[in-house]
């Protein structure tokens, strides 16, 4: 059974790139377009890993991560922040919110696949 990855990303083009990359690598991909839907989908679908954009509508990625990690049934799911915030200290904010990993956009497909596989093995 392939591992399920939830991509929480509001930009359609970024979702498509991640979906294509992960699907071609043999993963099942679920998608949410905002933090609120992402939290709900994480609870319903129980993915093996979450790729979380930080700048999201309705509920941002920091708050969505905090909500997921506050749920005892979900807190074990690794969350990797994928963000266009490449400023100093943003990785620390992502980790403080509960993220387990961090990528700045634009990202290398090879590097992101290696990190995803690292968390899923």
Segments (PLM) and residue ranges:
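Active-site beta3 strand of CheY-like receiver
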Residues: 45-51, 56
